Structures are given as C-alpha cells and as structure tokens.
C-alpha cells in the first residue's frame, strides 16, 4: 500500500531542474575564508571581472540564439545563397565559432561556484510500488530552467538526418559518377581519399594509443555498461560462494575438534564428584584464546602513525597509543601470565585443550563475510499513465569539474546533498537523507561514496571527446549556440544539396547532349574530322564540369563529416577504439573505477525491457563509468575533510575518537584490503543551530531541535579511486538474498538437514520477506529385525581398545582381512596412518597440538577439502569431501597430531543401530545433551573415539567396543529405551506453509473485559507453553501410564534487523545461520531436538532506502508488536501471527531479537523482569546471559539489564514474553563499534564474575600455591575449605557474605555504586583470614572508576579497545549457537531442580528481598542472621544492587538503590561525615521524609491490602507514578499495582504520611483516615488556646492507660517495611 509522502506526492516525475535564486548557498551558510589576503582579494576581483566579461559574452550568444529561434530560418538564408566556391569558407566559419565556443566554455567552467549539492529526484524501485526520493548531483549556477536544449540536441540521433545524408549513396548518383571510368576522372576522384582526412581519423591507429596502454592511469570508456555491471556482480557472487564454502569447512573443523577434546577431558573426570559441573564452565571457550591474539595483532597494527597528507591541522591519532610500559608492569606482576595461553589453571585436567596454536587462530581469522559495496543500483519505472512519454524528456544533470564527486544511488545509500566551502581547502558539508515521514531532518546511519578525480582527467583525450560528443550537458547552457549554429549549418547543407541537384540535372542535360552528339558522329564523321579540334574543346569543357561537380560533392561530404565529428565524434572514435583494441580488453586485468560525471546513463539503449503493463525500465547510474588501467599511487595523499551536519543522537561513541568505516576500490583490487577505519581527526560536536537546506524553496531553514556534526578527514592515496564511507558495516538485502541462494543450493537434497525457506509476507514496497525453518529429518521409527541382525554381525570384529591399540586396528576395527578393507574403501572410512599398506594406526587422536599443523597438512586440508566441497555439495553433501580428503590424506607431510575434518568423514548411508544405549542401569532422565550422544567409559585410562558408522557421519553417539558379541535380547531392550526419546518434526515441516497463511486479523482488546478473551485463549493452553511441569504434576504422573514415544520438537525463534541502521545484527545472524546449517556436533544436537525459525531481516524496506530506524511507512516496527496492523506493519503482523499459530500445537521456549547499540561497547542482553520458572532458586531468564558471559569474551554481563513491563512498550522481547509465557525472551545488543576489554584480561575467568570489569583471582596465583589452589577455590585459613566458593550466594562461617561483583573500600564512606575499599588485609572476624600475599588492591583496583552515566568510556590506561570486524561479528553469531547448546545442556542436567512459582510465592519472594534492605546495626546479630537467611532463600541476593554490604561502621547505612530515597537521604548523609552518629539521627531522617522501619514482613501484605481499600488512593498513586516518570529510573523494585498504575509501595506511604499530619511520628492510621470527621479532627489549627491542648492531652493520656494492649497491636499494623 502506498502512503503519501509529506514532502511530495505519489506521482512519478521526470528529472527536472529546480529554479534557483541569485543568492548562493555560501551566502546563506555565511562561509568565510579566513586565509584571504588583500593581494589575493585584488587578484580575485580581477579574475571575477574577466569571468563576468566572459559570462556576458556567453549570455549575448544565448540571446542571439534565442532571437534566431524566433526568426526561424532567416539567418540561414544567406548561407543558402553561398556558391560552391564559398563552401570552404563555410567550413572555416564552423571551426572558428566552435573554437570560440570551447574557449568561452573552459573559462565558464573555471568560474563555477565551488559549491556542489544534491537535489531530490523521484523514482520507483524495481519490481515494487514504492515512491522514493533520491539525491542527484547538479551545478551551482549557470543552468537553464528547462532541458529543451538536451532534447533538441538529441534530434540528431533520429533517422531523418541520417537518411538525408545517405541519399547520396543511391545508385543514381553512383552510376552517373561511374560512367566516367577514364583514368583522369578516377585519379581525380581518388584524390579525395588521400591521407588528409584519413590520417586525422587514423591518428588513433598510431603507437600513441598503444603506448598509452602501458602508461599509468590509462582511462578507457565502457561501451556496454550493462554487461560491465552484470559481469562484476557475477564475479562477486563467485567470490562469496567460495568464501561461504570455506567458512563452513573451517567452522566444522574448529567446532568438532573442540567438542572431541572436551569429551576426552570429561571422560577422565567420571570418577570425581561432579558437584558443580565444572566442564560446563570451561566448555567451548576457545574464543578467549583468540581475543588475545586479535588484540595483540590490532595493537601492533596501530602502532604506526597515520600517513602524512596535506594536513591543515595538527593530528594526533586517537586510535594509536603506546602501552608497552603498562604491559611490562603487568607482566612483571604476573610472571605466570605467559603460561596462561598454553594451559588452564585447572589441576584436574591432565590434557588441556591447547587452542593457542597459530593454525587454530588463523582458521578462526579466515572466517568472515564479504559485502562488496556499490554494485547494486536503484531502478526507475515509468508508470503506465506516463508510458507515452518520450525518452527525450528525461533530463540530464550537470556536474562541475571538481576533485571530489559524490554518489549515493546504490542500495542503502542515504546522502541528501553536499556543500563545498568556498575556499581552496577540500572541505565538504554533508547532509543525510532522513527517514521517510520523519518530522526531524536528521539521521544516524550514513552510507555514501566519494570519488577522487585528478586534474589530468579533464585534460585527457577521453574528456575532450566527451566535450565534442552529443553529451551537451557537460558544456552547459552555452551549447545553445552550438545547437542554433548546427541548425544553420543543416539549412546550408539543404541548400547545397538543392544546388547539387540542380547541377546534377544540368549534368544530365549535358550528358544527353553528348549522347546526341555521339550519335551524330557517325553521320558527320567527315564533318567531325574537319571539326575535331572543336569536339576536343567540348570534351575538355565537359571534364571541367564533372570535376567541378566532384569538388562540390567532396565539399558537401567534408561538411557532413565535420558536422558528424562535432556531434558524434566520441561515438565514432570510441567505436574505432573498441574495434582496434578488443583483444586488449579483459575484465580480469581491469581496475574498474568510477567517476561521477554523469547522472543518468541508460544502459539499456539496445534492449529496453518492457513489462506486460507497458512499463519501461531505466537504470539510474549516478556516474559516468569508465575503466582505469595501471592505477598509480599518489606521491602525496590528497586530504579531504567531511562534515556530516545532521546527525541525530546526542551521545555517540564517535566522541571518543572512533573512526567511521571506509572501503577503497583501489585498495581492494590492488592490495586486497577491505573495510578499514583509517579516518582521523574525528570530532563529534553539537551544532549551535539546526539548519537544513530546502532545495524546493532554495533557502536554508532552521529548526528548534538539536543536531550534531561528525567531522573526519580522509586521505585518498590512489588516483581515480572511489571510496565508500559508512557508520557501520553495510549489510544489504541483495547480499542476504545471495547468501540464502547459496544455502538453498548447498542443502538441496541433503540427507539429514531439513531446510525450508518460505516467504513470510510481502513488504509495503513489494519485497519478499524470507523466513527460514531449520531442523533435522526424523529418525526411522520402526526397525526390521533382519537389518538389526546384519548390523550386529558387522560389529563382530569390534574389540576393546586401551590407550595402546594393536597395530592392525583402524580405530578399534580389525583390518587384517581383505574383506574388511574393501568394505572400508566402499564406505569411505579414512585411515589415520599415512598409507594403507602400513597396518599401523595412530589411535590417540586427541594429542595436544604443540607445534601446530605442518605445511603439508594445511595445504592438503585447504586444497583437498575445498575441491571436495565445490564438487560434491550440489549432488551429495559428503561424497566430494571424502574424495578430496582421501586424495590429500596420503601426503607424506601429513601431521599425525592434527585432528582434522579428514578424521571426521561423513558416511553416506545411515545405520539403524546407531541409537543404541549401552548403560541399562543408568537413568538418562537428568543426563546432559552430549552424554546422550557420547556414552564413554568411566575408567580413566580407557578411552576410544569411534570413527565408524554414525560417529563417522555426525559424531552423535559413541559406540563402545566390546569383545563379546551383543545378543539380540539386549539390543532389543536398548532400542526400546531409545525409542522413548525420539523427537519428531516432519509433520511440522510439512505443514509449515499453512502456518504462514493469514487466517484472521489481530484485533484490539475489548474495553469491557480488558482483553480477557485473548488472555483466556492462552490460559487454556498455559501448561503446554511451559518449558517444564511442576513438581506436583510430576508426582501425579508417576502412576499414570507411560507417555507416547514420539515427542514434538520445541521451537526456537530468532529475528534480526528490525532497525535498518543496526547492521551488526545482520552479521551476527549471518554467523548463526552458518553455524546451524554446518555439519558440526553442536548444531547437529540442536537440530535433533529443536526447530529453528529465523527471520533474518524484518525491515527490508528501510534497509533498501537507507533509513536508520523507521520503515517505509514511518513507523518504528519494534514498538508495534502489541497491536500490529497487517497492511501497515506486514512483517511484524506476519511474524506474530506465525508465533501464535505455532503455539497452538507446539512449544516456543526461546525467543531472541538481534539489535545493535551505539552508546556502549561489547555485547549484552536485555531481558524481562518477571520469570515463571526457576532453576535452583534462580530465575531461568538469568541463566542464559551468565552462560554467554563465560563463552564469549566480549560479552558484558554488567550491561545486561532485566527491564520492567512499562519500559519499551510494544517491543518484541516484552510482547513475546507476555503473550507466549516465555521466560527466555531476550534482546541481544551488539555494539556498533567494538570491544572494550581490560588489559589484565586472560583466558582465566571466575565462574561468578564478569571478566571485563572485575579482575580475576589469577593475580594471587603468582605467589605460590599456598594462598590459592584450584583456580577458583581460595584457602585463606584453616576454617575455610577449598571447596567453598566465595560468591554472592554462599555464606562464610562467622562472617558476612562476600560478593565477587562488589568492591570494598576501607574509607568507611558510602559511595553510589555500593563499593567499599579496603587497604588492609581482608579479614572477617576470627574465622576468615587472608594472608599478606593476597593483595585486595591488585584484585579490585578501582573497578568502577570509569563508570559514568551507566556507560563505560574508553580509558586506554585500563582498557584495550578492539574494533568489530566481519570476523568477530561472524564469530559472535557462532558463539550464540554454542551458548544455546550449553543452555539446553544446563537445563537438561538440572531438570529436577526446575520449578514454577505461583503469584503468592512471587509475593513472598519480594518480601524476602525486602529483608535484605533492612537497616542493621553492628551489634544487632539477629537482624544480620535474618538477612543472611533471606539471601539464601532468594536468588536476587547475588545481585549487587539488591544486597547490602556490612562493614565495621558503627552505624547502619542507607542504600542508594531506592529510586526515591537517594535524592533526599544521600545528600544529607554526605554532609555529615562524622563516624559517631547515633541511631536517632538516622531515624529522624527516616521520619522526616515519612519512612518507617518495619520488623515483620507479614504486615507488608496487610498494608498493601489496606492501601488498596482506600477510596481516595487514585490521586496519591497518580502523583507517585508521575514523580517516578520524572526521575526516569531504570530499576523498579517492589512495585505493586494500585488500580491502573504500578508504583512502589514506599512512595505511596510517603505521600500518605505527608497528608496525615496528626501523628507526630509521621505515621498514618489505616483505613479510618478516609472519614471526613476524622480528617477534620486531625487538622491542627495554629490559633488554638493552650488550655484546649492541655485538656485534650489529659483525655488522651487516660485513654492510653486503659487500653495499652490495643495500642500495641495497632502500632504493629501501622509499621511498613522500608525497601531500600
């Protein structure tokens, strides 16, 4: 559906000029040149006067031409009267006037104002109905209002003129000329074929042009631009295809190797108690090794200073810094840091995974995405109503002769216009195109290109030919003179032709006379003999007439040729050059560059595509493409300063000097350098006033809102180079479609992966929104006995293998017989020995790779497997791989210790006995995911990895070797056990198309029932949406019959790119898709148990148009999930409808929406505050982020926030969590810039700490094993055992809780971040004592020093910074998939501890958390014990914000976590720094602001109920709610619903205490407070007498003495818990 644009209509317009006023843009912007001198000004004035004279001359010529138009053909009548003798003079006049015109044009070009800007043009995108505005480059001044000149000049392309010129090729004239075959006439005719004109045309045949092929910067024109673009796009697709296959290969090798190592280490620890399951924590952390390698490489690369160009400002690179001193200090403290890369500090792991080898790091580094910019352009369609419009009406726009020319016509480009400052410096002010229907003219995403064109281009022959060509738009308005003169010459030609016809007729008459004379010669022979002399005279006269005719004809030909040379000179020479040098042109040797010297370039001249509707397609190309051979590097870089003046966000990481991205075409094709950040002098400044140039009004407009300017400099190092600039890595819709096409071809007819790609919906612009559904095919449900017996017979040769295996065994299989060898060759099994002749096998496949892989192994791996992938993926996924691997595996240089993909070859046929379990006695209900797939021996020294059968294909199960043959009864019983655990998905995949159909429309909620119908629908199936059942339900089901053998797979939904400017999210989902479709063990296990539904791009329209946040209709799609409209928000509506249809029969257990963040570093997650299920008294929604923090080194757990319901209303995370009862509903945020990591970071980490902002316990490891043992266990004295971990959840005897995330200071001063600093040794009573060797200052060295406004800024003294690139973003998506595996693994292991809590339990949970904030004194041990007990029971105790730290301070301190207290109490407390404050002082502060301290927690619920009964509570609750919105606090603790508002109960009590002034202590008296009589009694009058007061007090004292017991009960009810 089309929506009218506010700025323009829906009609499609041709490209027209706008009427500009005489005021230049430089006057409007008040641009001044500070470097002007008086002498220069005088010189410039003289130049301006000369230029004005030239302009006046050109204007006079234009006026004369206009008069000539009005008079018609009168000025050409004189030319028609020219005689044949004056034709040469006519030709000379043409040359003279053309020279004058060229000279005047060259002067006028120099005098063009140095301002380049863009104007909007309307167009339609290809195959859509969208109406788009795009910028176009125009001149600064001296333009005509209309483009009639261009249209009239194009008339010479018609056939009328060519036919007139070709009239003289008829046979009549040629026959007449050929009648005279005498040698005299032929010689005379051939005189005009001399080398005079041919040499002029054949000048390009000389060696001058051929020599130029070897010159630098050889510019050549592209004749077939359409073929050139398509050819380049095909080459890019081939590169992406090879990269895609290589990424899958490298990814499979890394993940399979990692998984097998973990299984080996896990096998060695079966005999030990798995109390904490440490293999979960150390699982899959190979990226920790890689980040150190990446960081060191980045620092070495950035130590070199930037290339010195013609800088005009002093430059200090913000990205480079010297950190050698800080690193030396850190290494001196930690002498054992160098060993950290080779070994884990984990004593139980005897053979750790060594991932610091160079080959491993290079394999990870080679995995990346490549999106080459600038090869997809936007198209224009002429509407059917305008199909009658001639091609001549398409206007062409003018561009000046400048050094920098801009373009944004490619996909996702959003440049509006550019203004060049009027000085000698290359400084450009850029204005971005805002989002459609956006009120504010600003943007945050930018993507444009700038081309550097040297001066030599304008003196080049190609440019000269262009000036003589029909491209009169380069000549400007002065070409009117040429047009008028050409009309005059055309009339002269017509007159000459008419005269020629008269001469021809005269010749015919003379010829007839000659024939009559010849006929009479026979009769008058005798007479002619007498008069022979007279005939000779006549013949001579006849020859003279013929010669005269030939001369006139040649003159005509010369005139025609000269006219053609002026009009079509470039076409003729270009065709000649193409004919002459076809053999020299090859696209492979080109460095194809672009220069924006032409706006409209119709690449479909020969073939115009016509649709059924009659629409004619034209390509909009913002540049005049040409190729450049032998591009030369500049001796001195050409520096340009860019200023983007309408940036939107006030806080952006550009403030810290981070550079935008740039992509140079020359560097990519010559140096193979892709996107890089090499800009410098970066500034991000707030503008004093917001300005925007309105091209329609030709004036600068000023607005009230704020905008910001991003300034940066760039050095062009190559001539004719085109550089693309972007705020983040661009990821276009076309690149996504090509990527999905590669996946379709790869997974076509795949034996195991069930891949479906469907269209979710059509977007508003008419594009297809893809949705992916990925899982594995179901296993066979029934097994034949015969097949099982055959499989058992095949296992007869299986024997038990120890660490040392027999020489004649292939991984536990006997290969001595020839029959088994033939079977091995048929099925593609690979021997680990070098040659098949040698019956020796290397059985230890998991030897640590100390020296890495040798050259032969690396080369064989890359060559052999790459060939196998390319040849075998289309037909059979694994066939080619086995062939390629077998050919290369026989290489003598193969490294034995390298576990490669060759050792994990894939079997073509699946065997049915592969799902057998071998432990009948063991209960698998609470087993881990990889335990189900790998059933290994419990013995320490008996481990064998099977490379046969399914382990050889998918490594899903480990079949043990036994000497005895398994019987059929044992096998049958184990198959029954396996059948109960099967998961099905084929039915779901078959009906997936029906789920996408729009059966009904989501309507709004009913006002009467407040949406109870919709809620009721989900309540009916509420239990089905739960991840796990309750404990009571499990007990009740114990006596019930067994469940069905089939289990439906659960659903995981992932979405991305709802905001177009957040491109990093697309790269992350790109990496996850590559992970889930690859043939690695993690992905295979996930596909076996889950169905993945992925929507990789939700806002396709905004991505194509270059928007930052909004869609085509001007809506933020991430705020429309609550009530989407099908025809306005089609993608959101269809996605939500799909999830609702799925939830009817299946379970959605996980949802994540990928986003990007512009104000923070690293990666983090936003989750929902409420949670339904709990794991070990911990919310299930908090488990996944913690697991992710241990796997991904650049994940910041500190920035992970669980937001409330009233924040980000309508977001996908919130709505999916509410409506589908999802605990795990997240928003995954990735920084747009990079990673900020501490300099002391290493691969060691603590399970309960964040590795980025809290230092590890590794520093205590330097002083020996007495203080620290076991990595995470601390032994500081005899009273604390090594198994007691120090964290927020565990209690230490005789002391308080020690939290790893909280920092402690000794100064006894309360700080905002709940941090305390201690300079002495850390002591906790008599039970806990830490030695002097363990320094707390080294461990917690000002952790929160750099915390400002919830953002961590870049401090190069404490942190290292690393930019995100395609490699890191890709691996972020891969690690997300690994964390999903670990998360499911964790839940499957702790399945018995998962429970669901009701609303009452949640209220009790809130109450228990409140006890953590009770104000406790030092000597009050009862309160401390209660607080510790509440921390044990509640999972919220491990948070830093909810816990209260206790110190040696004499008085209790208030916490600043409460959002209403910190503004009042903290200020007053900071003023009073005396240590000896009494409790009365703090109680006075509490009573002053209406806070009461409660002792019992049960009264809290009673007070909530009592407040809800109040009749006039609305006003007070509303006041509290509005006050909370003004403060804008992100954390909301202990909120309770009161009517329509959800507020903090303590805030309500504070308001009630202010109203109730009767009680001196500031307490209110319950529900009786609403009575009007009581209210009147409570109001005190200042004018009351003292006697009345005394009488009242006496009466009160009597009543109090009688009812003491009653007053005590009432006072207990009045007290309320203060939640801090």
Curated annotation (Swiss-Prot):
GO CC terms, sorted: cytoplasm; membrane; microtubule cytoskeleton
Compositionally biased region (Acidic residues): 44-55
Gene Ontology molecular function, alphabetical: metal ion binding; metallocarboxypeptidase activity; tubulin binding
Superkingdom of origin: Eukaryota
Biased segments, Basic and acidic residues type: 33-43, 1581-1597
Enzyme class per UniProt: hydrolase
Cytoplasmic face of the membrane: 1389-1620
Gene3D superfamilies listed in its UniProt record: 2.60.40.3120, Zn peptidases
Cofactor note: Binds 1 zinc ion per subunit.
List of residues binding Zn(2+): 1059, 1062, 1155
Sites carrying sugar chains: 19, 56, 102, 354, 487, 508, 529, 550, 571, 589, 687, 802, 1010, 1064, 1141
Membrane association type: Single-pass type I membrane protein
Bias (Basic residues) ranges: 1598-1620
Location of the region described as Disordered in the Swiss-Prot/TrEMBL record: 32-74, 309-328, 1279-1329, 1560-1620
Annotated Peptidase M14 domain residues: 1004-1261
Protein name: Putative zinc carboxypeptidase
Species for this entry: Plasmodium falciparum (isolate 3D7)
């Amino acid at each position: 559906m089309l929506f009218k644009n506010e700025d323009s209509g829906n009609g499609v317009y041709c490209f027209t000029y706008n009427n500009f006023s005489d005021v230049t843009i430089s006057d409007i912007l008040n641009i001044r040149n500070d470097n002007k001198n008086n002498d220069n000004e005088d010189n410039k004035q003289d130049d301006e006067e000369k230029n004005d004279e030239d302009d006046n001359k050109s204007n006079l010529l234009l006026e004369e031409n206009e008069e000539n138009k009005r008079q018609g053909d009168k000025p050409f009548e004189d030319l028609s009267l020219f005689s044949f003798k004056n034709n040469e003079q006519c030709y000379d006049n043409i040359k003279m006037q053309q020279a004058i015109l060229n000279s005047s044009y060259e002067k006028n070009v120099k005098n063009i104002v140095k301002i380049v800007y863009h104007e909007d043009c309307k167009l339609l995108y290809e195959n859509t109905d969208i109406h788009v505005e795009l910028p176009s480059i125009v001149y600064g001044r001296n333009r005509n209002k209309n483009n009639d000149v261009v249209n009239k000049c194009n008339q010479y392309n018609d056939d009328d003129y060519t036919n007139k010129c070709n009239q003289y090729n008829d046979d009549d004239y040629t026959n007449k000329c050929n009648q005279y075959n005498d040698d005299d006439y032929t010689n005379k005719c051939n005189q005009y074929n001399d080398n005079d004109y041919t040499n002029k045309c054949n000048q390009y045949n000389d060696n001058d042009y051929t020599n130029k092929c070897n010159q630098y910067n050889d510019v050549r024109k592209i004749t077939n631009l359409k073929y050139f673009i398509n050819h380049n796009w095909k080459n890019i697709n081939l590169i992406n295809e090879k990269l895609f296959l290589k990424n899958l290969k490298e990814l499979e090798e890394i993940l399979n190797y990692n998984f097998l190592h973990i299984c080996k280490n896990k096998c060695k620890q079966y005999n030990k108690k798995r109390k904490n399951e440490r293999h979960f924590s150390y699982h899959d952390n190979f990226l920790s090794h890689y980040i150190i390698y990446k960081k060191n490489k980045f620092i070495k690369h950035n130590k070199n200073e930037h290339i010195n160009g013609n800088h005009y400002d002093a430059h200090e690179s913000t990205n480079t810094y010297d950190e050698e001193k800080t690193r030396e200090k850190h290494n001196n403290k930690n002498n054992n840091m160098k060993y950290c890369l080779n070994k884990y500090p984990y004593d139980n792991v005897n053979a750790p995974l060594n991932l610091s080898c160079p080959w491993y790091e290079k394999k990870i580094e080679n995995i990346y995405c490549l999106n080459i910019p600038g090869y997809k352009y936007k198209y224009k369609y002429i509407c059917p109503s305008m199909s009658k419009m001639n091609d001549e009406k398409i206007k062409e726009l003018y561009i000046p002769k400048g050094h920098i020319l801009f373009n944004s016509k490619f996909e996702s480009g959003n440049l509006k216009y550019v203004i060049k400052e009027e000085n000698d410096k290359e400084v450009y002010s850029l204005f971005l195109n805002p989002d459609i229907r956006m009120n504010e003219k600003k943007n945050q995403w930018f993507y444009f290109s700038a081309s550097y064109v040297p001066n030599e281009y304008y003196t080049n022959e190609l440019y000269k030919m262009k000036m003589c060509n029909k491209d009169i738009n380069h000549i400007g308005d002065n070409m009117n003179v040429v047009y008028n003169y050409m009309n005059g010459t055309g009339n002269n030609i017509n007159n000459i032709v008419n005269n020629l016809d008269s001469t021809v007729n005269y010749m015919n008459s003379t010829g007839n006379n000659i024939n009559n004379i010849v006929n009479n010669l026979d009769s008058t022979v005798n007479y002619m003999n007498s008069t022979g002399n007279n005939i000779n005279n006549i013949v001579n006269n006849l020859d003279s007439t013929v010669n005269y005719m030939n001369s006139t004809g040649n003159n005509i030909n010369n005139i025609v040729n000269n006219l053609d040379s002026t009009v079509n000179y470039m076409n003729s020479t270009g065709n000649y050059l193409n004919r002459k040098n076809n053999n020299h042109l090859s696209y492979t040797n080109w460095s194809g560059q672009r220069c924006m010297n032409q706006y409209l370039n119709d690449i479909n001249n020969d073939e115009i595509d016509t649709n059924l509707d009659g629409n004619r397609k034209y390509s909009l190309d913002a540049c005049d493409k040409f190729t450049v051979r032998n591009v030369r590097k500049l001796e001195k870089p050409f520096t340009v300063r860019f200023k983007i003046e309408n940036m939107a966000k006030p806080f952006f990481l550009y403030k810290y000097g981070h550079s935008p991205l740039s992509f140079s075409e020359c560097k990519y094709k010559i140096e193979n350098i892709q996107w890089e950040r090499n800009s410098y002098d970066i500034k991000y400044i707030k503008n004093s006033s917001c300005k925007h140039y309105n091209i329609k009004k030709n004036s600068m407009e000023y607005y009230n809102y704020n905008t910001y300017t991003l300034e940066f400099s760039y050095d062009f190092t190559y001539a004719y180079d085109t550089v693309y600039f972007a705020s983040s890595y661009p990821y276009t819709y076309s690149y996504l479609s090509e990527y999905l096409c590669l996946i379709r071809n790869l997974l076509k007819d795949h034996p195991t992966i069930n891949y479906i790609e469907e269209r979710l919906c059509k977007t508003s612009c008419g594009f297809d929104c893809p949705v992916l559904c990925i899982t594995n095919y179901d296993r066979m449900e029934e097994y034949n006995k015969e097949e099982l017996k055959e499989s058992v017979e095949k296992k007869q040769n299986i024997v038990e293998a120890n660490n040392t295996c027999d020489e004649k065994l292939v991984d536990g299989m006997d290969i001595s017989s020839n029959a088994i060898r033939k079977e091995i060759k048929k099925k593609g099994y690979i021997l680990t020995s070098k040659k098949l002749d040698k019956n020796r096998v290397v059985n230890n496949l998991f030897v640590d790779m100390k020296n890495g892989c040798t050259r032969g192994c690396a080369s064989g791996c890359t060559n052999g497997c790459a060939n196998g992938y390319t040849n075998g993926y289309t037909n059979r996924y694994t066939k080619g791989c086995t062939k390629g691997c077998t050919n290369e595996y026989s290489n003598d240089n193969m490294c034995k210790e390298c576990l490669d993909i060759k050792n994990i070859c894939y079997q073509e046929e699946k065997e049915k006995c592969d799902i057998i379990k071998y432990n009948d006695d063991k209960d698998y209900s609470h087993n881990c995911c990889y335990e189900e797939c790998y059933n290994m021996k419990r013995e320490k020294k008996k481990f064998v990895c099977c490379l046969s059968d399914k382990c050889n294909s998918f490594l899903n199960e480990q079949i043990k070797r036994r000497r005895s043959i398994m019987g059929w009864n044992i096998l049958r019983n184990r198959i029954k056990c396996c059948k109960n655990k099967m998961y099905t998905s084929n039915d779901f995949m078959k009906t997936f198309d029906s789920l996408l159909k729009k059966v009904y429309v989501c309507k709004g909620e009913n006002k009467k029932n407040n949406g109870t119908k919709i809620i009721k629908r989900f309540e009916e199936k509420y239990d089905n949406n739960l991840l796990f059942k309750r404990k009571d339900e499990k007990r009740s089901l114990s006596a019930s019959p067994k469940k069905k053998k089939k289990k439906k797979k659960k659903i995981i939904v992932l979405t991305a790119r709802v905001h177009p400017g957040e491109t990093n999210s697309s790269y992350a989902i790109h990496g996850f898709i590559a992970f889930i479709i690859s043939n690695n063990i993690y992905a295979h296990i996930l596909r076996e148990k889950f169905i993945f539904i992925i929507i990789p791009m939700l806002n396709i329209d905004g991505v194509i148009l270059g928007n930052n946040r909004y869609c085509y209709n001007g809506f933020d799609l991430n705020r429309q999930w609550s009530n989407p409209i099908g025809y306005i928000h089609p993608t959101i509506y269809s996605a939500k409808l799909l999830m609702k249809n799925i939830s009817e029969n299946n379970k959605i257990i996980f949802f994540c929406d990928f986003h990007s963040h512009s104000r923070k570093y690293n990666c983090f997650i936003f989750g929902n505050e409420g949670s339904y299920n709990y794991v070990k008294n911990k919310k299930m929604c908090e488990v996944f982020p913690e697991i992710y923090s241990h796997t991904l080194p650049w994940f910041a757990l500190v920035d992970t926030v669980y937001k409330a319901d009233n924040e980000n209303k309508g977001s996908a995370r919130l709505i999916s969590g509410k409506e589908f009862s999802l605990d795990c509903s997240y928003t995954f945020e990735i920084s747009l810039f990079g990673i900020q990591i501490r300099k002391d970071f290493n691969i060691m980490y603590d399970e309960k700490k964040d590795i980025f902002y809290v230092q590890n316990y590794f520093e205590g490891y330097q002083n020996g094993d007495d203080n620290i043992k076991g990595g995470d266990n601390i032994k500081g004295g005899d009273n604390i055992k090594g198994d007691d971990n120090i964290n927020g959840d565990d209690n230490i005897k005789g002391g308080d809780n020690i939290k790893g995330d909280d920092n402690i200071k000794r100064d006894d001063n309360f700080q905002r971040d709940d941090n305390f600093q201690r300079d002495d040794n850390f002591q906790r009573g008599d039970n806990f004592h830490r030695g002097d060797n363990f320094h707390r200052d080294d461990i917690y060295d000002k952790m929160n020093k750099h915390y400002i406004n919830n953002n961590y800024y870049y401090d190069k003294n404490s942190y290292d910074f690393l930019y995100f690139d395609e490699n890191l973003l890709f691996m972020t998506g891969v690690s997300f998939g690994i964390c999903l595996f670990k998360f499911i693994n964790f839940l499957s292991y702790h399945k018995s501890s998962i429970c669901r809590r009701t609303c009452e339990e949640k209220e009790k949970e809130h109450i228990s958390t409140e006890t953590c904030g009770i104000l406790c004194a030092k000597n009050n041990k009862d309160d401390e014990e209660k607080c510790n007990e509440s921390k044990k029971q509640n999972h919220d105790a491990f948070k830093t914000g909810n816990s209260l730290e206790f110190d040696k301070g004499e008085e209790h301190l208030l916490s600043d976590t409460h959002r209403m207290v910190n503004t009042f109490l903290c200020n007053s407390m900071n003023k009073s720094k005396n240590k000896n404050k009494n409790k009365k002082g703090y109680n006075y502060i509490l009573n002053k602001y209406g806070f009461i301290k409660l002792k019992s927690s049960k009264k809290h619920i009673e007070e909530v109920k009592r407040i809800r009964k109040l009749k006039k509570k609305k006003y007070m609750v509303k006041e509290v709610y509005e006050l909370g919105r003004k403060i804008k606090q992100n954390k909301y603790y202990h909120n309770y619903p009161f009517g329509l508002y959800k507020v903090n109960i303590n805030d309500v009590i504070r308001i009630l205490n202010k109203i109730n002034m009767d009680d001196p202590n500031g307490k209110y008296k319950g529900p009786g407070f609403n009575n009007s009589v009581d209210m009147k009694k409570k109001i005190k009058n200042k004018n009351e007498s003292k006697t009345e007061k005394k009488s009242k007090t006496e009466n009160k004292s009597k009543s109090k003495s009688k009812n003491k017991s009653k007053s005590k009960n009432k006072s207990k009810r009045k007290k309320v818990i203060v939640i801090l």
